[in-house]
A protein has these predicted regions:
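Beta-strand-rich modules
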Residues: 100-118
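Structural beta-strand segments of beta-rich domains
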Residues: 18-22, 150-154
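Solvent-exposed loop/turn segments flanking beta-strands in beta-repeat/beta-sandwich domains
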Residues: 25-67, 157-186
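Surface-exposed, short loops/turns at beta-strand junctions within beta-sandwich domains
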Residues: 71-72, 82-84, 89, 95-105, ...
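An aromatic-rich alpha-helical recognition segment common to small helix-rich domains
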Residues: 24, 108-110, 156
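Proline-enriched interdomain boundary motifs that mark the N-terminal boundary
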Residues: 3-11, 134-142
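Extracellular fibronectin type III
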Residues: 1, 115-133
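Residue-level recognition of beta-strand termini and adjacent short loop/turns
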Residues: 14-16, 146-148
Length: 196
């Protein structure tokens, strides 16, 4: 129902086209919780992957199981690496969410969970929308200087000081995304930080 019933107060801040920070304060200071931000598309994937049947918590359990298998721990022991207590500020923790798709819905997922893996609050989702890019009349002329294996050098001559991105990819990697129309989404989800 109502925001007053939510177990956490979640506020987004420093929202840009591709980044955001957030502050989470549990209404019960004794609750250990996990918070994760992702795009709405990814959230929907997490809810519906495998046998999750709409339960995003199962995505986290699957992740913790995989990590536990790698490090010789149970999935419940893995929770401590993600768990928070008290007020959490992603900016203060140097954990700004980056590489988000611009002008798109993002979700801050927050839930209380015990060290034994028992869900103790409803899963709270807080929607935030990243900003739309500001159109630019910047004219960019690219010149290929070096075209060698793992050594591609390009110079860019620009007509103004507006920010821009140059991202060199092999045709083999990019062609499928160009054809499917999701090139920008693929580039942003590649792990490259475009916040500056």
């Amino acid at each position: 129902g109502k925001t007053a019933d939510d177990p956490f107060v979640v506020n987004a801040k420093n929202v840009t086209t591709t980044t955001l920070d957030y502050v989470v304060t549990p209404k019960d200071d004794n609750v250990q919780y996990v918070v994760q931000t992702t795009g709405m598309d990814m959230y929907n994937t997490w809810c519906n992957e495998g046998e999750n049947n709409g339960d995003v918590f199962q995505h986290f359990v699957t992740f913790w199981k995989a990590m536990g298998n790698m490090y010789g721990e149970t999935w419940q022991q893995q929770i401590k690496y993600d768990a928070k207590k008290g007020t959490y500020d992603s900016e203060v923790d140097y954990n700004t969410q980056k590489t988000l798709l611009w002008d798109a819905d993002q979700v801050i997922i927050t839930f209380g969970v015990t060290k034994d893996g028992e869900l103790v609050t409803p899963i709270q989702t807080t929607k935030v929308r990243t900003l739309a890019p500001v159109p630019s009349d910047n004219k960019i002329k690219l010149t290929l200087k070096t075209n060698a294996w793992r050594n591609v050098v390009i110079t860019a001559d620009v007509s103004n000081s507006d920010k821009y991105i140059v991202n060199v990819q092999s045709a083999a990697a990019a062609d499928a995304h160009i054809q499917s129309g999701d090139l920008v989404k693929w580039l942003l989800n590649s792990g490259t930080d475009y916040s500056n």
